[in-house]
């Protein structure tokens, strides 16, 4: 969440930033509540000072055996006033906190202004899309023809947007995960295997709740949610903690299954592995000092790109515009892999700097020096990578005229075979 003091001091700049994001939010009511809250605080403090003075006078009169009944009645009245004002103050603070939970992060100055994905800016490309001299098949057809992906049985046992991996398809998924985790560990990330169920507070901490509740799978009758990404449990590892400044930055990588309702995705990517209710993903999460976070974003993005380079998959990196960024992000790079059947690049990773937005919600701080006041860390995360989409990209980019798929060299030690089919 944003810093209330910053919003109060810079209302016009914050309102302009929200407009650039396309957020239809007026700060007027929030700022009015803030003015009322501050006035109440002053009034309550004044009444408490008066109560203390009256209490001292009552004690003096009782000691002198003088009548203090009128003052006692006055103190009760002051106490009632304080309670009423405290109750109002609590209601206002809860209202302000709730409103703040719906206000998105402010875009970094380097983020291009725009309203949709059409305004995103390409940063770089790697690799050249392959030219095929035979009809290109989509990954879902390749998977079914090789008997390694079963969409029909996935739908039978669960419903739409679920897939069963079989034989070398299951091994390929596992091999991709292991390559990603081993590579990131070699590049300095500490592996974490997190819970797949988290509580509501964890979802609030990373910004999924309350705004995106319809996209989450909640466990009925409990406080639990299935995680939409390992970002949630890994970021919340340090909720309500003050981190050792000497140990920053902290780099974690985590493999997890991810669960998304995809409430707003009706009719989009209905076939294949691109948009599933359950999918595997490797996540990279960083906790850094504020002054280093944008350097760390560049490194994180390069770490995600490195996996695609190992696999020989063409991709491009784009900077998301203000209107296309996620709710909690201050800046985001999307990495898009080339999918021949689409004739286009498709997202396979989002790498974001959230600055102190998540840390403020989750109360994750560090002490810059031993006697310094704690400050909020900056948090970053990125997919390193989405596993199902990586499998889809391998099947499509590495397909052969005879219907087989050549395994990228980096995966062969994990697969034990060089080719699927053929």
Swiss-Prot record:
GO BP field: selenocysteine biosynthetic process; seryl-tRNA aminoacylation
Entry EC no(s): 6.1.1.11
Signal peptide: none
Lineage: superkingdom: Bacteria
InterPro entries linked to this entry: aa-tRNA-synt_IIb, aa-tRNA-synth_II, aa-tRNA-synth_II/BPL/LPL, Ser-tRNA-ligase_type_1, Ser-tRNA-synth_1_N, SerRS_1_N_sf, SerRS_core, tRNA-bd_arm
Residues involved in L-serine binding: 229-231, 283, 383
PANTHER family in alphabetical order: SERINE--TRNA LIGASE (PTHR43697:SF1), SERYL-TRNA SYNTHETASE (PTHR43697)
Domain comment in the entry: Consists of two distinct domains, a catalytic core and a N-terminal extension that is involved in tRNA binding.
Name of the protein this chain belongs to: Serine--tRNA ligase
Source organism per UniProt: Heliobacterium modesticaldum (strain ATCC 51547 / Ice1)
Gene from which this protein is expressed: serS
């Amino acid at each position: 969440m944003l810093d209330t003091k910053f919003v109060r001091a810079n209302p016009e700049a914050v309102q302009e930033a929200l407009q650039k994001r396309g957020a239809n939010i007026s700060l007027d009511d929030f700022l009015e509540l803030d003015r009322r809250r501050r006035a109440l605080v002053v009034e309550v403090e004044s009444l408490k000072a008066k109560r203390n003075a009256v209490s001292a006078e009552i004690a003096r009169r009782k000691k002198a055996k003088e009548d203090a009944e009128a003052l006692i009645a006055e103190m009760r009245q002051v106490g009632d006033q304080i309670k009423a004002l405290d109750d109002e103050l609590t209601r206002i603070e809860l209202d302000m906190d709730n409103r703040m939970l719906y206000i998105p992060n402010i875009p970094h100055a380097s983020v291009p202004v725009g309203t949709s994905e059409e305004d995103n800016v390409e940063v770089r490309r790697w690799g050249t899309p392959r030219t095929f001299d035979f009809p290109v098949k989509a990954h879902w057809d390749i998977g079914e023809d090789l008997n390694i992906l079963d969409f029909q049985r996935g739908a039978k046992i669960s419903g739409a947007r679920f897939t069963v991996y079989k034989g070398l398809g299951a091994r390929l998924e596992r091999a991709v995960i292991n390559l990603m985790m081993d590579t990131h560990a070699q590049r300095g990330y500490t592996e974490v295997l997190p819970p797949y169920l988290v509580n509501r507070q964890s979802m609030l901490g990373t910004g999924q709740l309350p705004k995106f509740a319809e996209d989450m799978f909640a466990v009925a009758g409990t406080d639990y949610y299935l995680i939409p990404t390992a970002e949630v449990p890994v970021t919340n590892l340090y909720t309500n903690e003050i981190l050792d400044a000497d140990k920053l930055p902290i780099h974690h990588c985590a493999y997890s299954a991810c669960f998304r309702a995809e409430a707003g995705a009706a009719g989009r990517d209905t076939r294949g592995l691109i948009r599933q209710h359950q999918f595997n993903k490797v996540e990279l999460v960083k906790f850094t000092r504020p002054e280093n976070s944008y350097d760390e974003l560049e490194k994180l993005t390069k770490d995600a790109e490195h996996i695609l380079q190992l696999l020989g998959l063409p991709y491009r990196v784009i900077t998301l515009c203000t209107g296309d960024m996620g709710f909690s992000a201050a800046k985001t790079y999307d990495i898009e892999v080339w999918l021949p059947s689409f004739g286009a690049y498709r997202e396979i990773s989002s790498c974001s700097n959230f600055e102190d937005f998540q840390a403020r919600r989750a109360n994750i701080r560090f002490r810059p020096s031993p006697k310094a006041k704690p400050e909020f860390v900056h948090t970053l995360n990125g997919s390193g990578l989405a596993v199902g989409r990586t499998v889809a990209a391998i099947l499509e980019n590495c397909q052969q005229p005879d219907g087989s798929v050549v395994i990228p060299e980096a995966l062969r030690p994990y697969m034990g075979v060089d080719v699927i089919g053929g």
